[in-house]
């Protein structure tokens, strides 16, 4: 491991390979688990984005859609942290950008929850700003991101939950690390991920963030480093692997000791931003399927393209069925 980061701890018992058919990023979903038992005092400490009040869709029918955003921002980051240089950027206001965007579709009547990750390179029409990557919409404010998704993809968004990377690391630290298995030696020289030997390890908060953010993921096999050419799409899959492990650990800890739930919430609450209309206690009823493990992942069909000299992703031929399901106008499509 790099000397600037505490090393991952080798686990004595090898875990089975983690199933990839799970849900998005850990910092958002662990916050959702925490909301299930949120207290009034903790709710008062949550930041409210007032600009979202006029753009969120009214809830209709038995389902609710939550936009879950993981933001890459230096606003709450510690300048002395070993990964500070990789968070945000010096040429953006506040070094702020969306790193992960997902939609959680919860049907309280059926007791089911579904997740869809939106690639940040998805080419969309940003109202008032023209066409660009989805990631660019967030730089104009969370209300523009919400408006973009609703108008470009036709999916009503009822609520907004955003957590930054400081909160991510706090949650992983509160969990005591997260267990992840690697089939080969693995690295990402851009994020600092460094796993020199295959096996299962408990990743600390720094290596966990490096793993979850990795877009230039390499494995060492057949005497050479082999890069994962899927970039953002590969990163989405790895985030889902990481999340399953983190959720499992959080559920185990909070089941054995309910006080751990409050500790996990406190680890995230100061870096949590939600829409003005979100009642955390009311939302708990809709988010219970996360805690019970009943979450199904639906991949969004996309294909690479070159537009305005930019490498982007555009919707694929099979995207319509998934978008219609999340919009509430059709039933769930089959998962391949």
PLM feature segments, named:
Residues 173-255, 336:
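Flexible, polar/acidic helix-loop-strand segments at domain edges
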Residues 94-98, 128-129, 136-144, 162-166, ...:
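Soluble non-cytosolic domains of exported or imported proteins
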Residues 61-64, 96-101, 110-113, 118, ...:
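Extracytoplasmic
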Residues 134-198, 284-287:
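Amphipathic, coiled-coil-like alpha-helical scaffolding segments used for oligomerization/assembly
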């Amino acid at each position: 491991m790099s000397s600037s980061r505490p090393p991952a701890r080798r686990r004595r018992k090898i875990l089975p390979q983690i199933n990839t058919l799970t849900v998005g990023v850990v910092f958002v979903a662990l916050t959702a688990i925490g909301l299930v038992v949120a207290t009034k005092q903790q709710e008062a400490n949550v930041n409210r984005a007032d600009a979202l009040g006029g753009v969120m869709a009214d809830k209709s029918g038995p389902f609710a859609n939550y936009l879950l955003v993981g933001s890459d921002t230096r606003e709450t980051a510690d300048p002395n942290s070993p990964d500070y240089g990789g968070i945000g950027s010096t040429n953006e206001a506040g070094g702020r950008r969306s790193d992960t965007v997902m939609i959680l579709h919860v049907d309280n009547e059926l007791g089911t929850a579904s997740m869809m990750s939106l690639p940040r390179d998805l080419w969309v029409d940003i109202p008032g700003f023209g066409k660009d990557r989805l990631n660019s919409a967030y730089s104009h404010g969370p209300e523009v991101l919400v408006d973009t998704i609703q108008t470009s993809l036709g999916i009503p968004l009822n609520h907004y939950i955003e957590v930054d990377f400081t909160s991510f690391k706090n949650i992983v630290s509160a969990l005591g690390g997260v267990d992840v298995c690697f089939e080969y030696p693995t690295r990402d020289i851009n994020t600092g991920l460094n796993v020199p030997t295959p096996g299962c390890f408990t990743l600390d908060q720094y290596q966990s963030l490096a793993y979850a953010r990795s877009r230039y993921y390499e494995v060492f096999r057949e005497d050479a480093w082999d890069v994962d050419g899927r970039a953002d799409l590969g990163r989405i899959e790895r985030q889902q692997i990481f999340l399953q492990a983190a959720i499992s650990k959080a559920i185990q800890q909070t089941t054995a000791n309910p006080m751990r739930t409050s500790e996990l919430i406190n680890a995230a609450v100061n870096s949590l931003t939600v829409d003005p209309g979100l009642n955390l206690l009311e939302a708990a009823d809709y988010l219970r399927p996360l805690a019970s493990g009943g979450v199904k992942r639906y991949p969004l069909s996309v294909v690479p393209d070159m537009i305005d000299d930019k490498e982007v992703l555009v919707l694929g031929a099979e995207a319509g069925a998934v978008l219609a399901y999340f919009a509430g106008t059709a039933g769930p499509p089959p998962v391949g």
